[in-house]
Amino acid sequence: MTATTIKEMLHDLQSELDQKSPGCLDYSISKVNRVYIRGDVHGNFDWLKDFCERENTTTNDVMILAGDSGLLFYGKGKTREKLLKDICHQAPITLLVVRGNHDNRPINEGMTLRWNDLVQGNCYWEDEYPNILYAGDGEMYWMRYKSFLTIGGAYSVDKFYRLHMHWTWYPDEELTDEEMRKILNDWSGCETDYIITHTAPLDHEPTWLFMQGIDQTVISKRMEKFLQR
């Protein structure tokens, strides 16, 4: 997939977001001006300031980060994590952060799930960083008259290497069976415009990006099989 193709896909998505269509939720007022999507920045936010200046954003614009943002990777109170959060907090934009396999769960950092008026759904955030929202797994959000279901988490293919090197790895990176059942019970039969995930359904795995030297037969596909449903 080329950069041009991805740009065209994002352009088509933005065009769809400008059209109202009913989903499972039906709110008559959208407080969000624009929705952007990006993933796997892994703690690199050097682009954010220029992006906000170019797009002339405000905190009523939402950037969805589809996993592995780095904002909940280093640990609460750690210098690197605080620096990244400070950078994002200073940017005139709201981030809706979906959990990746290299992200800690917000609840593990002392946050609680609560209603947010801007994205019209339940999410996590720290009071000192009100424009950094962490999406709940299996939560629905309503922006630009469209519904967004977020399902975070994935299996780390480099899990054993990380453990061997004593690098950060989160044992609850995948959804539990109970969490999967709850998502199915909550939203089965309910229309949603977009499902934002970190990993892909099994039939849509980007096999051309698989890491060389890793035996795929020993890699957990629980999340991919679940999303395939």
Pin down the residues of each PLM region.
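Short boundary motifs at domain starts and secondary-structure transition points
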Residues: 24-30
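Active-site-proximal loop/helix segment associated with metal-binding centers of metalloenzymes
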Residues: 4, 8-14, 18, 22, ...
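Short hydrophobic patches on amphipathic alpha-helices
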Residues: 52-55, 187, 227
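Histidine-centered catalytic micro-motifs
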Residues: 41-42, 199-201, 229
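Short, intrinsically disordered, charge-balanced linker/junction segments flanking boundaries
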Residues: 221-229
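Acidic/glycine-enriched edge-of-secondary-structure segments
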Residues: 32-38, 166-169
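Core catalytic region of metal-dependent phosphoesterases/phosphodiesterases
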Residues: 6, 23, 34, 38, ...
